[in-house]
Amino acid sequence: MPASVLVGSQWGDEGKGKITDLISGDFDCVCRYAGGANAGHTVVANGHQLALHQIPSGIVHEGVLSVIGNGCIVDPTVMFEEVDTLQAQGLDCAGLRISGNAHLVLPYHKDLDGAHEAALGKNLIGTTKRGIGPTYMDKMNRTGIRIQDMLDDDLFREKLEAALAYQNPILEKVYGLPTYTVDQICETYLPYAERMRPYIVESSKLLNELLDEGKSILFEGAQATMLDIDHGTYPFVTSSNCSAGGAVTGSGVGPCNIERVLGIAKAYLTRVGSGPFPTELSLDEGVGKFLLEKGHEYGVTTGRKRRCGWYDACVTRYAARVNGLTDLAITKLDVLGGLDTIKVCTAYDVDGVEYDTVPEHRVSFDHATPKYIEVPGWQEDISGCRSFDELPAAAKDYIKLIEDLSGVRVSIVAVGPDREQTINRFWK
């Protein structure tokens, strides 16, 4: 297994952290290839649950390299908060590596993120306000500052001067916010540069050398397919390519090295922030409230309630196509226990036209009406099941239905939040 990609198949929060935590110990290296501190994932370290945002989940496994690739953006404040937390739990983070080509999140990026979101009013996107969009905007505008730039004091100051000449007038005149000086930012960031220096590598070179040596790499996706800047529900998306294709550009590893693509999907559906969601249910009553409360559907990064709805096979079909999924991991199957019947969306009706996958035209998706089938639920607590055969017949049929509708085999089934509460069918 030279290289595999793990990717979210819905709108994020599918349980990628748990599945990465589960399988990453079988790899020599885990590499994050996109996103920044907006992507919360929960891992278990020495018996303690930790919420990580910046550092790859593989960090909890001794002997596994954890690489932050060139497609990521790095907030040193968040990163070293996580390093300190992990070290307090007895993990030395010696396996952490950071691409010198990854871009820096700077204080003005966060200010601009929050101000721009506020200016959108009722059309807000639902950003985490962690500076992600403005940082990627600078990257694409070729005015961004990379981690390697911070290692040279004079170069860092020179680039900051140029950046602030552009950003300060926007902060002051457009949004009425305080401006920054070069010295202000250097006072905070240059000490981080020295802490970061031992971890910085030429990540593409490192990753390809590992593959040449016969080592295995897991590319850990952040966010999800439906939040991808190109393939998601634009403009209600993140600012990076978080689908499987981003693993190539965000790491510098060629596509021929990737053997398997594991898509993570909840047994139902959730979404944080604005944007279309055809199978959405009310959180105030009925099944929507049931899923919110039993599934503890609150964002790791923001603490916001997640919007909840029925499983949408059209979204999974779309994710399978866009990512080239070879396998699926279905999480939170246990949450559905207690429902008499379960609805599954198999198609959309858009003004009398039927779609069996996500329409690429945004307006069509906004007006999509889900077409459901109903299947029997189950009352049993399945959190103790450790093999597929132990599941109730209705739960097994539900998994088989997902396979039939998506055309992708379900290799992993999660029946609880703990690493052990997992059924491994075909992932070897």
Language-model-detected regions and their locations in the chain:
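Non-transmembrane, aqueous-exposed alpha-helical and coiled segments at domain scale
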Residues: 1-428
